Each structure stands twice: as C-alpha cells, then as structure tokens.
Amino acid sequence: MARITVEDCLKQIPNRFELALAATYRARQLAQGHTPKIESRDKPTVVALREIAAGQVGVEMLKKVPA
C-alpha cells in the first residue's frame, strides 16, 4: 500500500495552510457521506489527502464554502 505524504499534496496545493483547509473541508464532506473520487478503504482524512495528491480536488473547493 502506497503511503501518502504532505509533500505529495504540496505538489498540487503549494501553500500548507490552504492544503490543511482543503483537506479538512474534504474530509468533513466524506465523513458526512459524500462519494469519494478515488477508491479507498481508508479514513476520510486519508482519502481527502489521496484525492488532493491525485489532483481530484484542490483549492477550488475552498471557494465553494458557504459563508
């Protein structure tokens, strides 16, 4: 099983703070029942990071957050 690292995700979202926000927001979505964009049996936080590293989700999801 391949391990996910922050460095893999930083290639997609270079700002660590935006990366943390995007991963948190996506992990919450997954925990609430949204469909994952990649196939994985991992916890929502790991799936969120895998999606970011794969380029499936990115910083654009922060612009969708309702105010």
UniProtKB/Swiss-Prot annotation:
The keyword Nucleotidyltransferase applies. Keywords: DNA-directed RNA polymerase, Nucleotidyltransferase, Transcription, Transferase. GO terms for molecular function: DNA binding; DNA-directed RNA polymerase activity. Its EC number is 2.7.7.6. GO terms for biological process: DNA-templated transcription. The keyword Transmembrane does not apply. GO terms for cellular component: DNA-directed RNA polymerase complex. The RNAP catalytic core consists of 2 alpha, 1 beta, 1 beta' and 1 omega subunit. When a sigma factor is associated with the core the holoenzyme is formed, which can initiate transcription. Belongs to the RNA polymerase subunit omega family. This is DNA-directed RNA polymerase subunit omega. It comes from Burkholderia mallei (strain ATCC 23344). The lineage of its organism: Bacteria, Pseudomonadati, Pseudomonadota, Betaproteobacteria, Burkholderiales.
